[in-house]
């Protein structure tokens, strides 16, 4: 049985971890995940999906704010793991830790060398890519730059958003890891170096990324909305207040960027730099998420054709 240390945080990671837990060839000695966070207005403490799964299976849990130089680092190095598996962990691994095991493998949600970094799925959708994928790669000190063990891809559908694509890629990543790891560990599967000249990056999403630019084409704004749903959610401004936009559809219409070009009891169409978008699901400041019909019956009833949002 191969003894593993698993490191990851979101549901993507938990899906990969569950695959390893269900496979009798592997023993998970411990998991390392991000600390619990206070979320929402009530500041409720939220544990990571990886921690929740580890609790259910009675696995030792380590949650350092920063792994490098921590007491937890000393403890996990003493576990005697043969190797490390990471998936969307969110921290760099110290060289001393990488050197302490026989192998260290990362499950990365992009077709490397494209989209190294922390938000590959967001960028794949926002950039209008036709496919996304997962790469199983060796870990080195440089971010997502290690040799590639295996790759698998899937089409990005017009109906996909970050949430749906995360779910698809998590399953692909789990299966790809379980399929390729035995041959990799036996030496039968030889890793392939990345073409570093082709590397692109997907840095973590900043608040500035969330703001919609209505001067872009309707397809670009549509992709941006999908690439922010369900988190962190794209927004615009209405009378100085933030208006989150979860879903929209491509529409016809011409006007100034951000201008209301159609308003009925059931629809609100906003002009973009080229074409227009029909808003479907929104969330005004201080209100719950709602359909555009509910919005137009409430806060949005004051909007008129010719008004401009986003200022």
From Swiss-Prot:
It comes from the Bacteria. It holds the Pfam family Formyl_trans_N. Keywords: Protein biosynthesis, Transferase. One of its GO terms (cellular component) is cytosol. InterPro entries: Fmt (IPR005794), Formyl_trans_C (IPR005793), Formyl_trans_C_sf (IPR037022), Formyl_transf_N (IPR002376), Formyl_transf_N_sf (IPR036477), Formyl_transferase-like_C_sf (IPR011034), GART_AS (IPR001555), Met-tRNA-FMT_C (IPR044135). GO terms for molecular function: methionyl-tRNA formyltransferase activity. (6S)-5,6,7,8-tetrahydrofolate binds at residues 110-113. It is an enzyme of class 2 (transferase). It catalyses: L-methionyl-tRNA(fMet) + (6R)-10-formyltetrahydrofolate = N-formyl-L-methionyl-tRNA(fMet) + (6S)-5,6,7,8-tetrahydrofolate + H(+). Its EC number is 2.1.2.9. CDD domains: FMT_core_Met-tRNA-FMT_N (cd08646), Met_tRNA_FMT_C (cd08704). Attaches a formyl group to the free amino group of methionyl-tRNA(fMet). The formyl group appears to play a dual role in the initiator identity of N-formylmethionyl-tRNA by promoting its recognition by IF2 and preventing the misappropriation of this tRNA by the elongation apparatus. Belongs to the Fmt family. This is Methionyl-tRNA formyltransferase. It comes from Streptococcus pyogenes serotype M1. The lineage of its organism: Bacteria, Bacillati, Bacillota, Bacilli, Lactobacillales. The gene is fmt.
